[in-house]
């Protein structure tokens, strides 16, 4: 799913996994776009999109990030009627659907980008008392890379050995 804590305005569209490694292996990164909006009954929890302008910007941001990184995204909400019953949101999703379908025919190529490389075995070598993995990996990816304004990718350490690793 879309990372729960960082899905509001000012953040990127990041899943809770290493999607770029999934795509590199020729697999589909299927990302649940659990985007909370003003239509929820949860109040101000979960960093939601608050009005029509934020809804437009946030939902298009999510599709743009997904398409540009080779992910497939699908809108999903589990909290009441939410955006399934909101006309503004449904209109945005209908327009996005056309763009999403068309994007499969667009030329795609790698572009120069920043790369975060994660050693997924490193957690075995630490004592976990200072939450280093959260600070060094999750926090930096969500608070740093997704907000820095440049293209980036997140890969596993073992990806560097692959012949098809992109020239980032």
Ranges and model annotations:
Residues 1-168:
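Carbohydrate-binding surfaces of carbohydrate-active enzymes
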């Amino acid at each position: 799913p879309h990372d729960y804590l960082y899905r509001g305005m000012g953040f990127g569209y990041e899943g809770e996994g290493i999607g770029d490694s999934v795509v590199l292996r020729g697999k589909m990164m299927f990302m649940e776009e659990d985007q909370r909006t003003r239509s929820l009954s949860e109040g101000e929890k979960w960093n939601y999109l608050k009005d029509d302008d934020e809804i437009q910007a946030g939902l298009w941001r999510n599709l743009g990030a997904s398409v540009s990184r080779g992910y497939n995204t699908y809108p999903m909400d589990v909290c009441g009627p939410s955006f399934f019953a909101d006309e503004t949101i449904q209109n945005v999703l209908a327009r996005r659907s056309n763009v999403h379908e068309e994007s499969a025919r667009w030329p795609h190529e790698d572009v120069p980008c920043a790369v975060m490389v994660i050693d997924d075995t490193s957690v075995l070598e630490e004592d976990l008392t200072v939450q280093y993995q959260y600070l060094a990996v999750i926090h930096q990816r969500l608070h740093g890379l997704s907000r820095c304004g440049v293209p980036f990718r997140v890969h596993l350490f073992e990806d560097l050995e692959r012949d098809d690793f992109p020239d980032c």
